[in-house]
Amino acid sequence: MKSTLRISLKSGERIFVNGAVLRVDRKVAIEFLNDVTFLLENHVLQPEDATTPLRQLYFIAQMILINPEGADQSTSMFRKSIVMLVNCFRNDEVLAELKRIDGLVTQGRAFEALKAIRALYPIEDQILNAQEMTPATVEQIRKEIAPWR
């Protein structure tokens, strides 16, 4: 880390830091003085909310950060899922970004990958609403990723 990182948390808010879950009992500011893997509670996707292909990919990628002990297994599932998504999506912007996201995870930059996946949600919503991806394809992806939910 080139500089310190300061994060403000509200009372009762949780943060996932290097696999540990911390909850604060009052408004606090935390300053990270060195490299750390963290995820803010409002960026954590719950299993029941992983209802679309990209949200399912996000859920798997967040497991790499939240559960360091299972990172190898999560990364393996991420690889399988990203290959499936690249084969299912036809939108050039989504395909290019999926390849970049795969590279981010390969480089150990899962946090940045999560941001990139979230940025694709509006495009995915348009694709699914226009049924550019068939319901059968979406269901196939859901079944493949179901063990993670």
Curated annotation (Swiss-Prot):
The lineage of its organism: Bacteria, Pseudomonadati, Pseudomonadota, Alphaproteobacteria, Hyphomicrobiales. Keywords: Bacterial flagellum biogenesis, Repressor, RNA-binding. One of its GO terms (molecular function) is mRNA 5'-UTR binding. Belongs to the FlbT family. It comes from the Bacteria. The keyword Repressor applies. It holds the Pfam family FlbT. NCBIfam families: PRK00794.1-1 (NF001995). One of its GO terms (biological process) is bacterial-type flagellum organization. InterPro entries: Flagellum_FlbT. The keyword RNA-binding applies. This is Probable flagellum biosynthesis repressor protein FlbT. Has a post-transcriptional repressor function in flagellum biogenesis. Associates with the 5'-UTR of fljK mRNA and promotes its degradation.
